[in-house]
């Protein structure tokens, strides 16, 4: 396939600030090979969503060229991530602005206030498409924010939404037990089903968790496992950047261990299917934390 024909999808996994830093390196590798211009779709989870949101915020809401990324954006992002303790800022916001059970909403405020992530999806460039992946508590499905769609097939979709970037990112990073759900008031929005027909929301409140509860790779917007694997229409080559770490040994201690084991096994199955797909079709890469690129 010619370079000019590439339509690259980036699936950037969760993993907190560690993931954000790892993904900066993957983007650097693409920029060094003048490939950022070929990126057509970015799907991000948790810390990766923070990374991409900061990238847009520091580049006038545009996805950077390879040259811009290397000379200006990467140094700026590194300084911001390393010098601003977002977790500490979010805790302060939670104490003074919200009830402490709304820590995810406090993260949104901290992202806007301390990282400068303002505006909505309607303010960022149309290409590449950016899908911020969350998990719906109510439906148990993959809930997505992007320039052209907000919602999931089981709950419905928001029409004409310019949803705030910081809020979508905070929802994507709302890890159960540590942070809790991000809460959305559904009443101000007009909802529709997949065909575009107006519907009434199933509840007044919608609660979103970290996208990693459903898919820590953020693969689904780009790659589907059906029919031996297939890409979305806007992608013909993809890179799964896995910044996660393997499950470690732990003595019996907490019930949350069952979540660790289940999530790890789901990720392993997704990774195996994706690796098999790109091996058969020669149309992707799978860099993993600790294994290089």
Residue ranges and their predicted role:
Residues 17-20, 49-52, 139-141, 215-217, ...:
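Flexible loop/turn segments at secondary-structure boundaries
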Residues 44, 133-135, 239-241:
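Short beta-strand segments
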Residues 60-107, 147-150, 160, 198-293:
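Non-catalytic peripheral regions of patatin-like phospholipases
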Residues 106-125:
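Conserved N-terminal structural segment that caps and organizes enzyme catalytic cores in eukaryotes
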Residues 3-11, 16-107, 146-147:
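Patatin-like phospholipase
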Residues 18, 125-225:
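Active-site gating loop/helix substructures
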